[in-house]
Design a protein with these regions (language model features):
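Short beta-to-alpha transition helix within the HATPase_c
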Residues: 2-16
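Conserved glycine-centered short motifs in functionally critical loops
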Residues: 13, 17-183
Length: 183
């Protein structure tokens, strides 16, 4: 519906701004979600998709060099589990740069230089307010606003958010939230 076309436009404009190519597929769009919840979901989803294109999907020549199709794939999948909706946003991009996340976390005093941290623990850091691995700010990112908005949204919806990633293969963001505001 209206939200799906807005999300598609968002991906197209982010691709134009970054010189990348990506195709968005939405699965389970007919999952029963309360319209109030859907309205509140629009902004977080725009952040999630912008992030997938800007940080995940590589430029066409980099994808070709990695043996991938020039056009990246982003799948937004919705499923219902009892009173909850589980949303997965998967991209086939470069995956999280765990080393860059660690460097930034040490610079910001979130980790000490010799403190061990698993990839999952490092992935959780990207959900923190003000966290970015970008050295420069562009119109899309670098301000550290984005996934923390999604994390805060999940908290207000009694939901949860999880990020997992495999180098060179992409990133999956899982968002769980109540299907209706009354539950």
């Amino acid at each position: 519906g209206v939200l799906a076309s807005r999300l598609q436009r968002n991906v197209r404009s982010t691709c134009q701004a970054t010189g990348k190519q990506a195709e968005l597929t939405i699965e389970g769009a007919n999952t029963l979600i309360d319209s109030d919840v859907l309205n509140r979901l629009a902004d977080p989803l725009l952040h999630v998709l912008r992030n997938a294109v800007d940080h995940g999907i590589e430029k066409p020549h980099d994808r070709a060099a990695a043996g991938k199709a020039a056009t990246g794939r982003i799948v937004l999948a919705f499923t219902r589990q009892g009173q909850q909706v589980v949303m997965h946003c998967r991209d086939d991009g470069r995956g999280l740069d765990h080393a860059a996340i660690r460097r930034r976390a040490v610079e910001r005093g979130l980790l000490s230089a010799d403190q061990p941290a698993s990839d999952d623990e490092l992935a959780r850091l990207i959900l923190m307010s003000g966290f970015t691995t970008r050295q420069t700010i562009n119109e899309l990112s670098g301000r550290g606003v984005g996934l923390d908005v999604v994390r805060e949204w999940a908290a207000t919806m009694n939901g949860s958010i999880k990020v997992s990633s495999r180098a060179g293969q992409g990133t999956t963001l899982e968002l769980r939230f109540a299907a209706s505001l009354s539950t």
